[in-house]
Every structure is written in C-alpha cells, then in structure tokens.
Amino acid sequence: MNRLSEQIEAIVRDRLANAKECLAAAKDTFQLKYYKTSAGRLYYAVFHLMRALLNCDGIEMKHHSGVISEFRKRYIKTQIIDSSVSDLISQLYDIRSKSDYSVFYEISAEDIEPFFEETEALFQEIEALLKTMYDNFSVEKGQ
C-alpha cells in the first residue's frame, strides 16, 4: 500500500473538511431558500473533493478549469471515479457560474435538490477511496 506524507495527509484532510463545510452550508442556505448560494456551496464542495484527490498525486492547482481537467483525466477517464461525476461537475460548475455572473438568472429548489445526494455520494466515495489507497490515511487528525 502507499503512504501519504504527514504534510500531504494534512492538506487532504483540510480539503475534505472544507468540502464538508461547504456541503453543510449548501444545506443551510437551501433551507433558507437561498438557492443560488446553495448551488455555489455544492459546487465548492465538489471542487475541494477534486483538489483533495489531486493533492494525493502531488498536484496543486488553483484554477477551476485546471482542477476539473486534471481530475477528469486522472480519475474519471481511468474509471477510478464513475463517469457520472463528470456530469455532476459540469452541471454544478455551470449553475454556479450563472448564479454568480448572469443577470436575472433564477434557480429553484427543484433545480438543485438532486445534487445533494450526488455530492454526498461523491464525498463518501472519495473518503473510501483514500482509505483504500493509503494505509495511513485517516479522515480525522491523529487517528
């Protein structure tokens, strides 16, 4: 089995914590009917999950397009992560971009509600993958 350095493991754990926080914020803002904000938080949850896996391979990218492209190349095209995740990424990126930059863009609860389950499933899949790939990996520090 492979081992992550303590530094990389700490970075990955931080990315997972950020993803978890974004997912919680997405749920909270959804309940408040702030659907654009909720969609943005869902996207960023997925973004942090992608960065966590890339960090395991020693890759640090900040630009969204680079992260998405490299994630697809390394994990989706190689079938490590299911190809349906590519659609999830595209849809959330598109909604987040329109929510942030388009005038008069509207989004409803029905538009984003399905993405919660998919994002939570991806979170669980990536955590399980990390535990399988790296024998010293733990989600929580010190475990």
Task: Give the ranges of each region predicted by the language model.
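Terminal alpha-helical segments
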Residues: M1-Q143
